[in-house]
Curated annotation (Swiss-Prot):
Species of provenance: Debaryomyces hansenii (strain ATCC 36239 / CBS 767 / BCRC 21394 / JCM 1990 / NBRC 0083 / IGC 2968)
Protein name: Vacuolar protein-sorting protein BRO1
Key words of the record: Cytoplasm, Endosome, Protein transport, Transport
Gene expressing this chain: BRO1
Compositional bias annotation for Pro residues: 891-900
Cellular component, GO annotation: endosome
């Protein structure tokens, strides 16, 4: 059985250019449209291509693609802004009245027309598939094609359903809501019809009569709804001028086609005012109305016919005859005008309907005659009244398929979203994304705060319990208690590596320091002997030329005394309190003596020897005591293992939290809902997006929050268990006993370490450096003493001078000086720092004044003119000569008292120079550099070159014989 299917006509359109309006908008926003030119050209070409497509896969794909890009254009471009400067005009012609054109600048009008044409193409394509199935000789291929046709009809209904729900104010009759709704019902009716015919043609054994009856009744209902919406079309015979739907006799009205009221009493059932259906405003062809009316009656007749066949199978012959009679009556009610209108529709398939009508009318008549005959002669079943027959329940086998469920449309949407103006994002979407980013950040901050608080709580508890250090120490103690022989070894391993390096440094210089100390004592004794011999040579000699050597000897001796005092303080750094420690450290870190410092056994040997008598003999210990000790140790080990497992679990939880937080950060960073916001920006307000979409999108992160909460709860459980088990372990008597011995060992190691470090910093470093500096100092002092001794011997053996006046006249004030060098002073490196030890002489090379050139002659660089000034404190000496040339040894004349008149006529002997150290007062305080009191003395005699008019030799003499008895003792 074959039927006639309607194909919706397409709307024609005029050419429209998209390039310039969109390019102007992009130029005003982005300033450069180079990257968008390709999309603009393709989009404009696609608009031109849809004007002449065929109803096939290619044409349908072009329309799907164009509509998809229109939707994206509406989402990415504010069309009101695009139309502000250069308006885009859309011209579309009415599908049922091609002469009527409608022009709009609204993008919604363009989308509605495109959807209408897409549905029209699909309806034509579905009809073509149905025709293909009828021509196909292969049953399997025909069935597959029929299924495809059914699918397309339902998709067409879905497209018109979407158009009906989203475009409410249509400017044309064909886009009016009633017209579009009529097309939805028509496509569903045709899909149901194709499905019914497929079931009928496949049920050769008539096993599905009941199902077919219900499906036919459903088809009747669909066409009834369609007819109710078009039965009021202009009864003057006006119809569409479209060629496919032209009616040959245009003078026939709908009343003529459907029959007079007398011939068709059922027209009252189709009163549109009673049905409540909206009336179609489009100019539907009258042939459509006639065909729809015919199908209403034809499928209602089929429904009663197949229901009667089913009753016959159930041996209900009376009821079967009644339904067959009703089926025959419905067929007879089809007016001749309706059949005439169908025959004049100009379509070849319309004749199939007339053939089906004739065939079904004959089949019902033959079957009804047979049933009446059998019932009259055999069954004698009562035939019920036709009015009392129950209604047949309808069944729908089809439904609308939404446009969003179309695989082709979804694929094109996905492709276009990533390739069609994908970089164009409206400003309002950027603002919404900023709000959403803040929501995500707040969610992340809340989770991070929970993690940080849990980590801090866990860390504080572990710190309070001193975990895991306390557990590690306890394990070491337990292992040490099991292996007593390794106690000393474990003590050695606990020694600070810094202490070992200190000990190695002390031991490496130990022999050198001892040698330097002995060398200092030897040289000091030799210097003293040299001074003694020099003094012996000068004893009893009062020559004026020897006075300067006596001064040098005094300074040399004073330097030796000061250096000796400094040596005593230096040697005092190693005293009876630390000499034993110094001797042990001098043997190195690997020596047994050093290791014994940290050995607990050696430190407690006395205590143990005193308590030997209190120890229990091994012979007195029975097996039960040994067994209880072993069991206690095993119990402690198991508790330690349990605590270790808890610590491992806590660490794993912490790592899992960190990993989960990192994953959450990445997910939040990569989360992009711009697509969702763009797609919903047209159908939801900003407030709805914030209050509905944002919370819904944030739910995707809830699993991370729940997982973090679970980890935190597990962490709290483990921490409570850890506290309980650690308290239980700490209260164990065996653990307390072992911890006390370990504490003694730790205290011993700390005490010895502090003692060694203190000795190293406060004693040995100063001691070693002082010895090295002292050796250098005494070597130079010895060289000076030997030189001075030789010069004295030469001067003593020299012939005496003639007279005082001759000596005075021959006094050499030039730069040459042949006398011995001044004794060196202890330099800076040989002046050890003793902290607050007052009264200790300290030596510094800077105490020698640069104003004493006689002391600087031939001295090493460190005792040159810039460093040989000696302060007036601590009994030190300084020379107060000024303005002398380097290398000379010229002394100013002493400030003699005025001459007395009684001695004016007598010759006065030459007075020896004044001793330089008479200007200073020795003190017991520290020897410090006091340049203010020694560098510029105020009452010193002036150099002879400083002013000849002020020389004392031109003044009256006040010489007294006993005023220079200072040297009489020498």
């Amino acid at each position: 059985m074959k039927t006639y299917l309607f194909s919706i006509p397409t709307k024609k359109t005029d050419e429209t250019s998209w390039v310039k309006p969109l390019n102007n908008y992009l130029l005003s926003i982005y300033g450069n449209t180079t990257e968008y030119q390709s999309d603009l050209e393709k989009f404009d070409k696609l608009r031109q291509d849809i004007r002449g497509v065929n109803p096939d896969n290619t044409g349908i794909k072009l329309y799907y693609n164009y509509y998809s890009q229109l939707e994206l254009l509406d989402l990415r471009f504010p069309f009101s802004t695009v139309n502000r400067h250069k308006k885009v005009n859309f011209s579309w012609y009415d599908a049922f009245q091609p002469s009527v054109v409608h022009k709009q600048t609204a993008l919604a009008f363009e989308k509605a027309c495109v959807l209408f044409n897409l549905g029209a193409l699909l309806s034509t394509y579905a009809g073509a598939k149905y025709e293909e199935a009828q021509r196909n000789s292969s049953i399997a291929a025909a069935d597959e094609t029929i299924k495809e046709s059914l699918q397309i009809f339902q998709q067409t209904a879905g497209i018109y359903q979407f158009l009906n729900e989203n475009f409410l104010h249509a400017p044309s009759n064909d886009l009016h809501q009633a017209s579009v709704k009529f097309l939805v019902k028509l496509m569903l009716a045709q899909a149901q019809e194709v499905f019914v015919l497929k079931v009928i043609s496949g049920d050769l054994e008539q096993n599905k009569n009941s199902l077919i009856a219900k499906l036919c009744q459903g088809t009747t209902n669909h066409y009834t709804e369609c007819f109710n919406m078009v039965c009021n079309i202009n009864k003057s015979g006006g119809g569409s001028s479209h060629d496919d739907f032209a009616v040959t006799d245009t003078n026939e009205s709908v009343d003529d086609i459907l029959g007079d009221d007398d011939d068709d009493d059922d027209l009252g059932d189709y009163n549109p005012e009673k049905s409540g259906e909206p009336q179609v405003t489009a100019s539907i062809d009258s042939a459509w109305v006639a065909t729809i009316h015919f199908k209403v009656q034809f499928y209602e007749s089929l429904s009663h016919y197949f229901h009667g066949l089913q009753l016959e199978k159930n041996n209900k012959y009376g009821d079967s005859i009644a339904y067959l009679t009703k089926s025959q009556n419905i067929l007879n009610e089809i007016s001749s005008a309706t059949l005439k209108a169908i025959s004049k529709s100009g379509s070849n398939d319309s004749y199939e309907l007339l053939d089906n009508y004739k065939y079904q009318k004959d089949a019902v008549g033959i079957k009804l005659t047979e049933m009446n005959k059998d019932n009259d002669f055999i069954y004698h079943d009562i035939i019920p009244s036709l009015i009392t027959l129950p209604e047949i329940k309808p069944m729908d086998g089809v439904k609308t398929i939404p446009i969003n469920n179309s695989k082709l449309f979804n694929d094109l949407n996905e492709y276009n979203y990533s390739n069609f103006f994908n970089n164009v994002v409206p400003i309002n979407i950027h603002e919404l994304l900023s709000f959403y980013s803040e929501e995500k950040s707040q969610f992340l901050r809340n989770e991070l705060d929970l993690v940080d608080v849990s980590n801090e709580e866990s860390a504080s508890i572990l710190e309070y319990l001193k975990m895991p250090k306390s557990l590690v120490n306890l394990k070491e103690i337990m292992n040490s208690s099991k292996h007593v022989d390794t106690m000393s070894t474990s003590s050695e391993t606990n020694i600070d590596p810094g202490v070992r390096s200190i000990v190695n440094e002390v031991s490496s210089k130990y022999q050198t320091d001892m040698s330097n100390k002995d060398h200092i004592s030897t040289i000091r004794k030799e210097i003293y002997n040299t001074i003694t011999e020099s003094e012996s040579n000068l004893s009893g000699k009062f020559s004026e030329s020897l006075i300067k050597y006596k001064d040098d000897l005094v300074r040399l001796k004073k330097s030796l005394i000061d250096a000796s005092n400094s040596d005593n303080n230096l040697f005092g750094l190693i005293n009876n309190d630390n000499s034993h420690l110094y001797a042990i450290l001098g043997k190195g870190a690997d020596s047994p003596e050093f290791k014994m410092l940290f050995n607990v056994d050696s430190q407690t040997s006395k205590k143990q020897s005193n308590n030997v008598e209190n120890e229990i003999s091994l012979l007195d210990i029975d097996d039960s005591q040994l067994s209880s000790s072993v069991n206690a140790t095993d119990s402690i080990d198991s508790k330690i293992k349990s605590i270790e497992d808890i610590l491992h679990d806590l660490n794993s939880i912490k790592n899992n939290k960190a990993k989960l937080v990192d994953t959450l950060k990445k997910e939040i960073h990569n989360d992009d809902i711009s697509d969702i916001l763009i797609l919903n920006s047209k159908i939801k307000s900003t407030n709805e997006i914030k209050t509905v979409i944002f919370p819904e999108e944030l739910k995707k992160f809830d699993p991370y929050g729940k997982e973090l909460d679970n980890l935190i709860e597990q962490e709290k459980t483990f921490i409570n268990e850890l506290k309980n088990q650690w308290a239980n372990l700490s209260d164990d008597p065996k653990v307390k006993e072992i911890q006390s011995s370990k504490q003694f060992q730790s205290n011993l190691i700390k005490h010895q370490t502090d003692k060694i470090i203190k000795f190293y910093n406060q004693n040995w470093k100063k001691y070693s450096l002082g010895l090295s500096a002292g050796v250098d100092f005494y070597n130079k002092l010895l060289a000076y003493a030997r030189s001075l001794k030789q010069n004295i011997a030469t001067a003593v053996n020299a012939p005496p001078q003639s007279s005082f006046n001759e000596n005075f006249s021959n006094l050499n004030l030039g730069p040459q000086h042949s006398g011995p060098r001044a004794p060196p002073r202890p330099n800076q490196s040989y002046r050890p720092s003793y902290g607050d030890q007052s009264g200790t002489p300290q030596y510094n090379a800077s105490h020698f004044s640069s104003n004493s050139p006689s002391l600087n002659h031939n001295l090493p660089p460190q005792y040159s003119q810039s460093s040989l000034h000696r302060s007036s404190t601590g009994g030190s000496f300084a020379s107060h000569h000024s303005n002398e040339s380097p290398g000379s040894y010229s002394r100013p004349p002493p400030a003699l008292p005025p001459k007395r008149p009684s001695y004016s006529a007598q010759p006065t002997p030459h007075a020896p120079p004044q001793a330089p150290y008479t200007q200073f007062q020795p003190q017991a305080s520290n020897y410090t550099d006091n340049s203010s009191s020694s560098a510029n003395p105020t009452n010193l005699p002036q150099h002879p070159d400083s002013g000849t008019n002020d020389l004392i030799y031109n003044q009256p003499s006040t010489y007294q014989p006993n005023m220079y008895n200072f040297f009489s003792s020498n």
